[in-house]
A protein has these predicted regions:
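Loop/turn segments within WD40 beta-propeller blades
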Residues: 17-23, 60-66, 104-109, 115, ...
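WD40-repeat beta-propellers
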Residues: 1, 16, 35-39, 77-81, ...
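Solenoidal tandem-repeat scaffolds enriched in leucines and small polar residues
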Residues: 1-58
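Blade-level signature of beta-propeller repeat domains, shared across WD40, Kelch, NHL, RCC1
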Residues: 143-168
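Loop/turn-rich, solvent-exposed surfaces of beta-rich toroidal or solenoidal domains
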Residues: 97-123
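Conserved strand-to-loop turn within each blade of WD40 beta-propeller repeats
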Residues: 29-32, 71-74, 115-118, 157-160
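WD40/WD-repeat beta-propeller blade N-cap
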Residues: 6-13, 50-56, 92-100, 136-142
């Protein structure tokens, strides 16, 4: 049974993420370079987050639901405050620039993992806004990042058919 249909009428939706703390809230991002926060009960947009210059490829909520991160075609990962709508942080990997295709927080939110279409994964310290390391994560475009429920692992999956599980 369909509960609601959300339609911003602004391009293709490439990613979505449900709030970890509010069962009525979800985010969508895509080719419009916008992120919309929705209320599923009303099928209405609660807030629109701007500032991206290209497709929004992936989203992940901060573990307490107070913020979220985006991975964008312009190589940037951005963190936004859900309540105020303000951009908290913009993270750009070192050259060569490539599309950010995946993003995931650690269970504490202190670390942010970002994947790229050049098979690289960056690990960021979200408090200092600094890159901690860059890892090789397969042989091709990274399609997805996810963390384990216990927070001990993050997995990366790519177009080469491989999934790599990393200890945090």
């Amino acid at each position: 049974q369909v509960v609601s249909t959300l339609d911003a009428k602004q391009g293709d939706v490439l990613c979505l993420q449900m709030s970890p703390t509010d069962p009525h809230t979800l985010l969508t991002g895509g080719t419009s370079a916008l992120v919309h926060m929705w209320d599923k009960r009303t099928a209405g947009i609660v807030r629109t987050f701007e500032g991206h210059r290209a497709d929004v490829n992936a989203l992940d909520f901060f573990p307490d639901g107070s913020a979220f991160a985006t991975a964008c075609e312009d190589s940037l990962c951005r963190l936004f405050d859900v309540r105020t709508g303000s951009e908290l942080l913009s993270l750009d990997r070192p050259p060569p620039r490539s599309a950010a295709t995946a993003v995931a927080f650690s269970s504490s939110g202190r670390l942010l993992f970002s994947g790229y279409d050049t098979h690289k994964m960056c690990v960021w310290d979200t408090l200092r806004g600094e890159r901690i390391s860059t890892l090789n994560a397969g042989n091709t475009h990274m399609a997805y990042l996810g963390r384990s429920p216990d927070g001990r692992f993050v997995a990366s999956a790519g177009w080469d058919g491989k999934t790599i599980v990393w200890g945090i």
